[in-house]
């Protein structure tokens, strides 16, 4: 695995496995919402009413709808970090 993907892959994989709703902001400002169904080196497959293939180079930010816990590399499986939470104004 490339050094630059040491955080990206576990983050996306956790979002996929736990079916966490996400907001994906593209570099042109468009906001997409849905669940990550799959991903590879170049694309993320986002599922909502339809499936959308989003190229990673077009993504600015991925914001989970709730806190996500990731195991730290090189530490015990019980050690975890928390990745942000999207604020709701409802």
Swiss-Prot record:
GN (gene name): hfq
Family membership noted in the UniProt record: Belongs to the Hfq family.
Record has RNA-binding as a keyword: yes
Gene Ontology biological process terms from the UniProt entry: regulation of DNA-templated transcription; regulation of RNA stability; regulation of translation, ncRNA-mediated
One annotated Gene Ontology cellular component of this protein: cytosol
Domain (Sm): residue spans on this chain: 9-68
Gene Ontology MF annotations: RNA binding
Record keywords, A-Z: RNA-binding, Stress response
Function, in words: RNA chaperone that binds small regulatory RNA (sRNAs) and mRNAs to facilitate mRNA translational regulation in response to envelope stress, environmental stress and changes in metabolite concentrations. Also binds with high specificity to tRNAs.
Subunit structure: Homohexamer.
Protein name per Swiss-Prot or TrEMBL: RNA-binding protein Hfq
């Amino acid at each position: 695995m490339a050094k630059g993907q040491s955080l990206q892959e576990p983050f996306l994989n956790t979002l996929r496995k736990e079916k966490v709703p996400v907001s994906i902001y593209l570099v042109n400002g468009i906001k997409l919402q849905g669940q990550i169904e799959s991903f590879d080196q170049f694309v993320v497959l986002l599922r909502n009413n339809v499936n959308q293939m989003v190229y990673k180079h077009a993504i600015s930010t991925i914001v989970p709808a709730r806190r996500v816990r990731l195991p730290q590399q090189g530490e015990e499986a019980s050690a975890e970090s928390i990745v942000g939470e999207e604020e709701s104004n409802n």
